[in-house]
């Protein structure tokens, strides 16, 4: 991150117990914030966002298992500078073997996420997921989506000041969905495939009961907040997204 040809401020959240010895980091561009515990994905990133320099025009939220070349961040910053309506961008994301991660999505209805989590191998769940993740699209052109993955979110600071940070009621899962739709409501959330990163994500064929519990709690909170059935903003955002491909 420090090798990119930009002025950057890196905030590292150390949630280990006891804290790691990071005294070897002497670069003034790096701030280490020890929390002493895992506070959750959203809350941890909120601490980093609050600690970031107020002079930053953009904030980057990314997973620790993500790799990118030094050209990616400058390329996306250049794109957002040229497109002031863009509040957030995400690059093309690949698995380590070079295959595509389909991370451009619609705002889900409950059946979408229930199907993905518990009935993924059924025909109806596969059909819904095909539209939800745009399997019939080539992922090679700039397009707008209301839900972009939290593994890499480059966010315009002025937009983030308007929407607020992550909702800390989600410990794990759905925090990126919630923030992405709030940003999409006030600006454009764009997929920019001219830049590419590698995400070493590995899905669990049999997720632990603990993770299933986190998912159930977070999704219950999400749909209770935005609406289980009646969610006009969801319908409008999804219709706008699908209309891009009907022209």
Task: Describe every region a protein language model picked out.
Residues 108-145:
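Short, flexible, basic/aromatic active-site loop/helix in glycosyltransferases
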Residues 137-140, 144-196:
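A short, conserved alpha-helix in the catalytic core of glycosyltransferases
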Residues 67-103:
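Conserved donor NDP-sugar-binding/catalytic core segment of glycosyltransferases
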Residues 177-181, 185-247:
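Active-site-adjacent helix/loop segment of glycosyltransferases
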Residues 55-67:
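Short beta-strand-to-loop acidic/aromatic patch adjacent to the donor-nucleotide binding site
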Residues 1-37, 47, 51-54:
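Acidic donor-binding segment of Leloir-type glycosyltransferases
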Residues 39, 65-68, 170:
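Acidic metal-phosphate-binding loop of nucleotide-sugar-dependent transferases
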């Amino acid at each position: 991150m420090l090798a990119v040809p930009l002025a950057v401020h890196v905030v590292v959240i150390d949630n280990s117990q006891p804290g790691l010895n990071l005294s070897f980091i002497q670069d003034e561009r790096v701030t280490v914030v020890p929390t002493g515990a895992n506070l959750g994905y959203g809350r941890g990133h909120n601490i980093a966002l609050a600690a970031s320099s107020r002079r930053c025009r953009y904030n980057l939220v990314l997973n620790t298992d993500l790799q990118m070349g030094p050209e990616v961040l400058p390329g996306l910053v250049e794109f957002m500078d040229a497109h002031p309506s863009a509040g957030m961008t995400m690059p093309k994301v690949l698995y380590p073997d070079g295959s595509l991660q389909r991370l451009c999505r619609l705002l889900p209805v409950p059946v979408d996420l229930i199907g993905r989590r518990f009935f993924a191998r059924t025909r109806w769940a596969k059909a819904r997921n095909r539209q939800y993740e745009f399997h019939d699209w080539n992922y090679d052109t700039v397009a707008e989506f209301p839900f972009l993955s939290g593994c890499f979110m480059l966010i315009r600071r002025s937009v983030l000041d308007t929407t607020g940070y992550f909702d800390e009621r989600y410990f794990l899962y759905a925090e990126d969905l919630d923030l992405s739709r709030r940003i999409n409501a006030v600006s454009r959330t764009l997929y920019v495939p001219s830049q590419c990163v590698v995400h070493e994500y590995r899905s669990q064929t049999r997720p632990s009961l603990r993770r299933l519990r986190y998912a159930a709690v977070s999704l219950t909170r999400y749909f209770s907040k935005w609406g289980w059935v009646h969610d006009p903003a969801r319908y409008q955002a999804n219709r706008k997204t699908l209309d891009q491909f009907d022209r």
